[in-house]
Every structure is written in C-alpha cells, then in structure tokens.
Amino acid sequence: MSEPLKPRIDFAEPLKEEPTSAFKAQQTFSEAESRTFAPAAIDERPEDEGVAEAAVDAALRPKRSLWRKMVMGGLALFGASVVGQGVQWTMNAWQTQDWVALGGCAAGALIIGAGVGSVVTEWRRLWRLRQRAHERDEARELLHSHSVGKGRAFCEKLAQQAGIDQSHPALQRWYAAIHETQNDREIVGLYAHLVQPVLDAQARREISRFAAESTLMIAVSPLALVDMAFIAWRNLRLINRITTLYGIELGYYSRLRLFRLVLLNIAFAGASELVREVGMDWMSQDLAARLSTRAAQGIGAGLLTARLGIKAMELCRPLPWIDNDKPRLGDFRRQLIGQLKETLQKSKSSPEK
C-alpha cells in the first residue's frame, strides 16, 4: 500500500539561505614591491595606562583654546593702551620740564621692556616645545619613507640641539655606518639605535635616581607634610632635568601646566590604602606582608614619579619609540623594591649592633 500524502505546510517567513564565507581575491606582490613593503607597527599599551597617559599628555603638551586667545587679545590691547598713555605722559613731562614725572616714565618704560622680554622668552620656549612635537612627527614620516636626502640633515640637527659634540664616539659610529646608498629610513634608524640611546640612558638614570629618592624619603619620613613637599620638589626637578637633557627649556607657563600633574602625584603619595592595594598586585603576597604602610606608600610614590618621568621623556624625545625601546614601569619596580628591602634590612640591623 502506498503511504498517504502529507498535508502542505505553509511558512510565515521566507526560507533563509545559509551564509557563505566570502573569500578575498588572491593578491600577489612582485619582487620589486616586496622589497618596499613595510609592515605597520601596532602600538600595544596596557589598559591601565590609558587614563594616566592622557592626563600627563594633556599636562605636558601645550594646547590652544578660545579663552586663551581672548585673554591674549585683551592683554595685547591693554599693553598698547599703556604704551600710548606712557608716550603721552612722557611728551607732557618733557614739555613742562617735569623731571620727576619724566623719571617715572623712564622707570615704567624699563618695567614694560622687561615684561615684554619675559613674554617673548616664554613664547619662544613654548614654540620650542611645539617644534619638538613637529620634529617627532617628521621623524615618524622619515622612518616610513624611502626617499633620499633628508635623513642626514635631520639627524645632524637633532644632534646639534642635544648638544652632542661632533667628536662623540656614538656620533662617530653613526657617521661611519651611513653611506650614500641608504635611504632616509635607514639613516634615521641608525641614529635611533646608535646616538639617541646616549641621551635615553642619561634620562633613565635620572628617573631611577629621583624615583628611588621619593621611595626612600616617604618610606622613612613620619610627617605627611614633608612627604608632600618633597614629592612636589623632586617631581619638578625631574621634569627640568629631563627637558634639559633633550635640549628643551620650560618656561613659567609650561611649569604651571605641569604643576597640575604634580598635585595629582602628591595626592597619590598621601593615599595609603590605594597604594597598598596596587602594591599587592605588583608584589608577591610574602613581600607585601613584610612591608609596612610607609614602605608601601614609598613604592607607590616612586612608581608614580617614574611614570611621570617616562611620559616627560617620551614628549621631549625628538624620535618616536621604535623596537619596544620605551622604558617600562617594571624596569624601575624591581630596582625600587630591591633598594627598599636593602634599606629596611640596614635599619633593622643597625639597632642590633
């Protein structure tokens, strides 16, 4: 017997086709194109550094705003009015032979001249800081360029700005390594590997020294007010040292921008609970159990000082970081913990003697 026919089934939605994977067309490179191929570098940063890096970048990098332009315009108009009024007073004093008023006008002219000179000097320092950012962008373009003729002049300008003498061994090795057949990317890359590490090593030593001083001072100091003053002073000194090493001089306005970040660093130095929690993640449970509250605060303040120095070092360098040569907090962390343990052991052994 034949089976009965099944009733028809009506579906409310149309039949969906199964998605098929789309394959891209094969792409082949010729031998000439493969020689000029350069892989793009991926900048991998830890997630926990995002907020802090943005805060330091905003504090160090000069920026323009509408309010600043309005204030500058008002100051310029006020200055022009003062100069015009001073000229009128001088003419009246000369005509009436009022020598006292004429002397006052001369003193005012000297004060105004000193103020104008300070403004020009401050503008020049801010302009130099902006130029360093432009030089870093230019270096990044040269490191991805295959042109010839710009790399050597650019590197010689950087060496002159940094105060590196022509007879310096690192610069002599760079001159011996370059030749006419190399392009700009190779020349700048050789400079980054042979000459730039000389300045970077000095900056690393300064960061290590200042971070160690902050760690030890806070670990042994019983007064919170002394800790805050010491952190503020050493952080500003560290910024000045790093900028001097890379040939940049900060002005008064730039230091005001940095002071905001220094206050943030001071706040971390006084937050003992937060520092202890962060220290538990960074150190083993055994070591954290042996350290006192002051020692944990010292390590936290030292690491924050090192972070500030690393960011200032990054913004003052004329070249971008390449080949993962950027200093890490872990490089300074082990050194700080070792120095702190050694200091605590010495302090425990001295009363026994």
UniProtKB/Swiss-Prot annotation:
Skewed-composition ranges (Basic and acidic residues): 1-19
Transmembrane feature ranges: 70-90, 100-120, 213-233
UniProt feature coiled coil, ranges: none
Membrane topology term: Multi-pass membrane protein
Entry superkingdom: Bacteria
GO cellular component, one term: plasma membrane
InterPro entries in UniProt: DUF697, UPF0283
Keywords, ordered alphabetically: Cell inner membrane, Cell membrane, Membrane, Transmembrane, Transmembrane helix
Pfam families: DUF697 (PF05128)
Segments for region (Disordered): 1-35
Subcellular location: Cell inner membrane
Main location: membrane
HAMAP family documented for this protein: UPF0283
Cited PANTHER family: UPF0283 MEMBRANE PROTEIN YCJF (PTHR39342:SF1)
Similarity annotation: Belongs to the UPF0283 family.
Record-given protein name: UPF0283 membrane protein YcjF
